[in-house]
Amino acid sequence: MAEQGTERGALRALLPVLDAHRAMTVRTFVAALADQAALVALVTLTAHTVGTAVVERQAPGPVTITALLVLVAARALATWREMDLSHDLAYRVLAELRVRVFDGLARSAPARIQGRRSGDLASAALGDVEALEFFYAHAVAQLLASGVVFGGGSVALALLEPWLLLPVLPVAALLALAPLLESRGRAVRGARTRAAAADLSAEAVETVDGLRELLAFGALDARRERLRAHGRALGEAQRSEQAWEADAAAVRDLLVVVAVVGVVLAAAHTVAGAWAPAAMALALGVLAPVADSAAALGQAGGLRAAAARVGAAVRAPAGAPAPAAPRPLPAGPLGVRLRGVRFDYGDRAVLDGLDLTVRPGETLALVGVSGAGKSTCAHLLARFWDPSSGAVELVPASGPPVDLRDLAEPDLRGTVSVVGQDAPLFHGTLAENLRLAAPDADAAAFAEAARVAGVDRIAAELPDGYGTRVGERGTTLSGGQRARIALARALLTRPRVLVLDETTANLDTEGDAAVSAALTEGAHLRTTVVVAHRPSTIRRADRVAVLESGRVVQTGTWAELVAEGGAFARVLARRG
């Protein structure tokens, strides 16, 4: 029920986006008002002209003909202008919404996107936003204009032939009420369509990403059948939605027919002569915008699910809120301290009062069995999340520690770099991927980072060197090459704290040793935390910390921990 309540107000919640486009919204309203008013005036004058010619056998004079021509031209111009302005407004708003959705996802990442399929996220960022085009282009300004035209036309009709309002007002009330009565059924069908579209999008993206594996294991036929099933589900949802719209349109048409019959019967007893056709045309003309508005409101009701998804993304809370008063960081090397840190994923506790200190310039290996919380520590150091309790601090050589929560985003990202095992590459050149974090880095810094990570040798083997396109997610490169590029990208920012989350896991022993040896250059100027499983990587660290059950249970050098045994020995035993 709470979800339904959220969807019920979802479209209304997206109206404030128009605040930044007030001038264009007003112009769109004026154009829609001119369009609808010109139509009512044209229909009424045409009916009066025909009535005069038939009843009084009097041909229209030059003034009437001129007025008709002016109204035709005005209607054509107003229609064109309204369509131009309304779609211009809608696409500007959609462009802004896409940015807001992306900002919301980025602000709440990775908590909000963890476990969600990339196709589903793409559907929210693109498909759901695109679906709202109808709402902004055909509903908002047009509804306001319809209300003004109906009100003005009703006043005019009351002054000329008030009896004709008797059939018009009840039908107008029913037309206005119809979208409210059908809103729940339409919203359910609209939500089903959007969910089916998101599922199909997610399946398609996963199929393309895993095409090689599907071919290798002979699973493509089964996957193709899954895509067909999702396609059928989407088709059925769309047919159900269209059938509902057809039924709603039939009800609206029936109400208009009732109004026509009522107006004809009322006019037969109250209006005589050449004014009869004009009075009936005016009565039905003021009803037409109401019928169009009812249709627009009905269709907009089917967009509530899309609006709710977009609104949820736009208003997503920050996973790591910005500080009200950011603190500056002192110059020089920085150590790291996790003090009494607790963290959980929902109802699953991962870290339970963890305490860990890494001295400035030290390289510490973080080890433990799978699920011990090593990667969670890396994510907390990057402030992808904040701890449930406790603090993650940067500790200068002299002076008080600085909580990550007190750092401005640019200062944090320029100080701490995290490289994961599967750091993604983008569909661009090798150079563009390297410069992602430091686009203004000079040539010397670029060359140095590439040399340290061994990317210069990768570039030498590529057809266009650093100008070679690496493909989406770096699919043209090996896992080891991608790891080296991700490492070089991080080094290019010249971080004072470097966190390697199994970065060299995809490298062979020789490659791992080469990267580790390269990282010793300038190691005293930065603090390095290495999440590792490979014994050779652990052995090269200055110190080792062993995690078990969400806490640090052992610390020391390789030799000290080997001699001590305990949890460290159990970790090594599992690695063979």
Where are these regions (language model features)?
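ABC-family ATPase nucleotide-binding domain "signature/switch" substructure
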Residues: T376, G414-S417, N433, A449-A453, ...
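Transmembrane helix-loop-helix hairpins at lipid-water interfaces of multipass membrane proteins
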Residues: D19-A78, W163, A397
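Membrane-integrated ABC transporters
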Residues: M1-L39, P60-T64, S86, A131, ...
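ABC transporter TMD-NBD coupling linker
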Residues: A283-D347, D386-S388, E393, A441-A449, ...
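An intracellular "coupling" helix at the cytosolic face of ABC transporter transmembrane type-1 domains
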Residues: L15-M24, P110, V129-Y136, V140, ...
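Helix-loop-helix
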Residues: T52-R57, A156-V168, D247-A308, A313-P317
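Transmembrane helices of ABC transporter permease
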Residues: A20, T25-L33, H48, A141-R192, ...
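Cytoplasmic coupling helices
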Residues: S86-D103, A141-L144, P167-R212, A219, ...
